[in-house]
């Protein structure tokens, strides 16, 4: 029997507001434990929540960017459960009247575009953070308690773990572009739970789903889903029954492990939050927020193709993160040719960032510096090989490309008399290479060029070297 995989994702995104959703407590990441909290966050008796308007507008902005319908009447509800990181024994969330519904985004997998529906986007408060010491006790930090977040629930439209990865990449990109969150998984500002079930191909009814947690990266989401997909298939093929449960992905064992039997919404005993009135969002407010939405990745991608003449692949890679797209655009604005700027950002820059595990904001390279170096290549002042030395200096120490070239004596040698001597020396030292070339071995030219570049410390002008070399060989 063959099965179809059905996947839905629940993504929690912390909003980048200056204060918490129901109190004036600040929300910086990395503060000393339990220093960014208040009696409201901790649910002391007699205190009342006050809704943060900026959090509402950030949620609206995110929902609009995800093509959601924005509610006119919305409200908050209490989600009741006991856990050490939940001091009130309930969480203020939204149940039956979310702020956004019926959205969608488009993903691209294997060269094909697919629309993934978004069931809802609702606003809620985050919980505290537990740290398990391994010594028989746990520590709880309530700094995160009350931080505003949105939960974005996809439709069960995802059919493969690869599609799930693409969906998360696209969702993160859109949210980052809006500016409502930095979406840093390593800081907990983006978290994902995945629901997965299998059903016989052709069957409309969904199978029993399991929820996956402990997914610390998009790669873990994909791997966890791949392993859970195999586990469920093995259970079903052996005549077993899938239980509705919560499991976690363990990277060490490459397996999903049972955590607990999955709760349903009835277990949370939702009821309307009595300390907050219903929220009315009129058309004027909606349009005011909509006007703040910047150019989103798909729009920018289209512009790069149509106006800058970039290949579709380049445009897709560059617009994946707002940071990279902004850097590229500023580099072009400083005079660099668009395709050359794209090549450097997708090549040397990305390779360096990946190797050093850094972001663009962490390095000294500036758009001015990169543009200056590209212009020196275009003018023939430096070769592509020399440019790599200049690039290393720019990305590690910053500065002006032209100044670096002059100070380090890296100007490309284009003087014909100097190049002629280099060519003559190489030919005199390698007579066999001349014979090899004349006998049809084209690789001999590559060897000779390499010798000349070595002698010039990479500074000889390659096109001129090739031209002079061929002319001199003909004379011998």
UniProtKB/Swiss-Prot annotation:
Disulfide bonds: none annotated. Its EC number is 6.3.5.-. It is an enzyme of class 6 (ligase). Keywords: ATP-binding, Ligase, Nucleotide-binding, Protein biosynthesis. SMART domains: GatB_Yqey. GO terms for biological process: glutaminyl-tRNAGln biosynthesis via transamidation; translation. InterPro entries: Asn/Gln-tRNA_amidoTrfase_suB/E, Asn/Gln-tRNA_Trfase_suB/E_cat, Asn/Gln_amidotransferase, Asn/Gln_tRNA_amidoTrase-B-like, GatB, GatB_C_1, GatB_Yqey_C_2, Gln-tRNA_amidoTrfase_suB_CS. One of its GO terms (molecular function) is glutaminyl-tRNA synthase (glutamine-hydrolyzing) activity. Belongs to the GatB/GatE family. GatB subfamily. Heterotrimer of A, B and C subunits. This is Aspartyl/glutamyl-tRNA(Asn/Gln) amidotransferase subunit B. It comes from Bacillus velezensis (strain DSM 23117 / BGSC 10A6 / LMG 26770 / FZB42) (Bacillus amyloliquefaciens subsp. plantarum).
């Amino acid at each position: 029997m063959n099965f179809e995989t059905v996947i839905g994702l629940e993504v929690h995104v912390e909003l980048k507001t200056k204060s918490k959703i129901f109190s004036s407590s600040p929300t910086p990441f990395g503060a000393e434990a339990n220093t960014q909290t208040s009696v409201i966050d901790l649910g002391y008796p007699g205190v009342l929540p006050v809704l943060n308007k900026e959090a509402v507008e950030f949620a609206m902005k995110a929902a609009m960017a995800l093509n959601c319908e924005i509610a006119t009447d919305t409200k908050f509800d209490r989600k009741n459960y006991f856990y050490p990181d939940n001091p009130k024994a309930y969480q203020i969330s939204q149940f039956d009247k979310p702020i956004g519904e019926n959205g969608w985004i488009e993903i691209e997998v294997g060269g094909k575009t697919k629309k993934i529906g978004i069931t809802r986007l609702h606003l809620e408060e985050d919980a505290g953070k537990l740290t398990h010491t391994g010594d028989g006790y746990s520590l709880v930090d309530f700094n995160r308690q009350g931080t505003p977040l949105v939960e974005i629930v996809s439709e069960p439209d995802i059919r493969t773990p690869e599609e799930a990865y693409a969906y998360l990449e696209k969702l993160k990109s859109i949210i980052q572009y809006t500016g409502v969150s930095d979406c840093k998984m390593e800081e907990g500002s983006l978290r994902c739970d995945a629901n997965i079930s299998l059903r016989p191909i052709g069957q409309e009814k969904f199978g029993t789903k399991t929820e996956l947690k402990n997914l610390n990266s998009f790669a873990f989401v994909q791997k966890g889903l791949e392993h859970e997909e195999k586990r469920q298939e093995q259970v079903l093929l052996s005549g077993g029954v899938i239980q509705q449960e919560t499991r976690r992905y363990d990277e060490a064992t490459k397996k999903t492990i049972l955590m607990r039997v999955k709760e349903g919404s009835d277990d949370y005993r939702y009821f309307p939050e009595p300390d907050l009135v219903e929220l009315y969002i009129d058309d004027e407010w909606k349009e005011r927020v909509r006007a703040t939405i910047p150019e989103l990745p798909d729009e920018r991608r289209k512009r790069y193709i149509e106006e800058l003449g970039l290949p579709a692949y380049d445009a897709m890679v560059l617009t994946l993160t707002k940071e990279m797209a902004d850097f590229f655009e500023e580099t072009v604005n400083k005079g660099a040719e668009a395709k050359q700027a794209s090549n450097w950002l997708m090549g040397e820059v990305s390779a360096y960032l990946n190797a050093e595990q850094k972001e663009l904001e962490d390095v000294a390279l500036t758009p001015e510096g990169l543009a200056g170096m590209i212009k020196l290549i275009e003018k023939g002042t430096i070769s592509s090989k020399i440019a790599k030395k200049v690039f290393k200096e720019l990305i590690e120490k910053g500065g002006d490309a032209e100044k670096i070239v002059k100070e380090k004596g890296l100007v490309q040698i284009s003087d014909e008399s100097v190049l002629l001597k280099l060519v003559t020396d190489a030919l005199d030292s390698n007579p066999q290479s001349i014979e090899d070339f004349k006998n049809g071995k084209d690789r001999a030219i590559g060897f000779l060029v390499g010798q000349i570049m070595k002698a010039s410390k990479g500074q000889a002008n390659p096109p001129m070297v090739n031209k002079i070399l061929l002319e001199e060989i003909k004379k011998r």
